[in-house]
From Swiss-Prot:
Binding site for [4Fe-4S] cluster: C28, C32
Molecular function as annotated in GO: 4 iron, 4 sulfur cluster binding; ferredoxin-nitrite reductase activity; heme binding; metal ion binding
Subunit structure: Monomer.
A Gene Ontology biological process term: nitrate assimilation
InterPro entries the UniProt entry points to: NIR_SIR_4Fe-4S (IPR051329), NO2/SO3_Rdtase_4Fe4S_dom (IPR006067), NO2/SO3_Rdtase_4Fe4S_sf (IPR045854), NO2/SO3_Rdtase_FeS/sirohaem_BS (IPR006066)
Residues passing through the membrane, by range: none
Tissue: Highest expression in roots and hypocotyls. Some expression in cotyledonary whorls.
Pfam families listed in its UniProt record: NIR_SIR
Induction: Strong induction by nitrate in roots and hypocotyls. Strong induction by light and weak induction by nitrate in cotyledonary whorls.
Protein name in the entry: Ferredoxin--nitrite reductase, chloroplastic
GO CC terms, sorted: chloroplast
UniProt keywords, alphabetically: 4Fe-4S, Chloroplast, Heme, Iron, Iron-sulfur, Metal-binding, Nitrate assimilation, Oxidoreductase, Plastid
Cofactor annotation: siroheme; [4Fe-4S] cluster
């Protein structure tokens, strides 16, 4: 939970997003936070970093929604080390949600 808040705060500090983006986070393999129905979903996992060390990471899903036009999000990035999540999500926000980088950081 603390990691999700820290990443979200960094995204808020660095990005201007024109509309709300629903981000769901879970460490539960049963997807208790329903990451597949979020605009961007993060499912905790163990992965390897650039030095092949086992670290905490996330699988990233995008495009989920509920309602009449329901759709499960697609797995777009698998095993992203947590330290690398912010730049990956910044690019997703730009590409899929019309976000821009803030210049007055």
């Amino acid at each position: 939970k603390a990691r999700a808040l820290k990443i979200t705060e960094e995204l808020d500090r660095t990005m201007e997003v024109p509309k709300p983006v629903r981000m769901h986070w879970t460490g539960c393999p049963n997807t208790c936070a329903q990451v597949q129905v979020a605009d961007i979903g993060f499912m905790g996992c163990m992965t390897r970093d650039e030095n092949k060390k086992v670290v905490e990471g996330v699988d990233i899903f995008i495009g989920g929604r509920v309602g009449a036009d329901s759709h499960l999000g697609d797995l777009i990035h698998k095993g992203v080390p947590c330290k690398d999540v912010v730049p990956v999500v910044q690019e997703l926000l730009i590409k899929h949600f019309g976000a821009i980088r803030k210049t007055n950081m």
